[in-house]
Amino acid sequence: MDIQTEMTAPPLSGGLDPAQARDAADAVRNAIYRATILLDSQKWDEWLALCADNFVYDIKAWSPEINYDMTYLHGSRKDLEALIRLLPKHNTDHSPLTRHTTIYTVDVADEGATAKGVSAFIVFQHLLDGTNSHIDAGESRLFLVGKYYDTFRIENGQALFTSRETRLENRRLDKGSHWPI
C-alpha cells in the first residue's frame, strides 16, 4: 500500500494566506522594535510617524490600595504632538532611558488589515542629575517594568500604531518622566 500525505502549514490567521499573515506579523514586530529605538533616541516626531492619525496612547497601572486603574497619561496623537512640543520647556529629568522590549504575541486579524501585539518592557534610567547628583550621577537603575498592549492598522506592508496601552507594574513615576515610555 502506497500512501502519500502532503504536509501543509495551517493558516496562521483565519482565512488569510500564511505568507501574508507572516508579512503582516513581521511588519508589526518591526514597528514595535523601531518604536523602542526611536523612544530611546528621543526622536519623538519619528516615533509619532509610526502612529496613525487616530492613535491613542495610555499609561496605566493597577492600584491594589484603591482597587482601581490609575491613569498617568491619556492622549490622542494631537495631544502627544502638543506634549512633545511643550515638555522641553518644563523641569524634566534629562537622564536618558534605555528600553528593552520583548515581543510576546502578534495576532493578525483574519482580513489582514489589523493586528494586536503584546510585549514586555524594562526601562533603565542612566542618572545624570537630581537631588543626589554628586552621589548618583553615572549610575544606571531599573526605572520601570511593564507591558505594551498595541493595536495596529496594516497598510501597504507597514504597521501603524492605532493604540498603545503602556501598563506599568510599578506605580511611581519620578519628576520629569512625562515623556512617552
Swiss-Prot record:
- List localization entries: Cytoplasm
Q: Which reaction does it catalyse?
A: methanesulfonate + NADH + O2 = sulfite + formaldehyde + NAD(+) + H2O
> What does the entry say induces or represses the expression of this protein?
The msmABCD operon is induced by methanesulfonic acid (MSA).
Quaternary data: The MSA monooxygenase system consists of 4 proteins: the 2 subunits of the hydroxylase component (MsmA and MsmB), a ferredoxin (MsmC) and a ferredoxin reductase (MsmD). The hydroxylase component consists of a 3 alpha (MsmA) and 3 beta (MsmB) subunits.
Q: What is its main location?
A: cytoplasm
Annotated organism of origin: Methylosulfonomonas methylovora
Which GO MF terms are attached to this record? methanesulfonate monooxygenase activity
| Pfam (any one) | SnoaL_4
Q: What is the lineage of its organism?
A: Bacteria, Pseudomonadati, Pseudomonadota, Alphaproteobacteria, Hyphomicrobiales
Membership in a protein family:
Belongs to the bacterial ring-hydroxylating dioxygenase beta subunit family.
Domain of life per record? Bacteria
Primary role: Methanesulfonate monooxygenase (MSAMO) mediates the primary degradation of methanesulfonic acid (MSA) to produce formaldehyd and inorganic sulfite by initial hydroxylation of the carbon atom prior to spontaneous cleavage of the unstable hydroxymethanesulfonic acid. MSAMO has a restricted substrate range that includes only the short-chain aliphatic sulfonates (methane- to butanesulfonate) and excludes all larger molecules, such as arylsulfonates and aromatic sulfonates. All MSAMO components are required for enzyme activity.
What does UniProt list under activity regulation? MSAMO is inhibited by metal chelators (such as bathophenanthroline, bathocuprione, neocuprione, alpha-alpha-dipyridil and sodium EDTA) and by sodium azide, sodium arsenate and potassium cyanide.
- Keyword terms, alphabetized: Cytoplasm, Monooxygenase, NAD, Oxidoreductase
Q: What is this protein called?
A: Methanesulfonate monooxygenase hydroxylase subunit beta
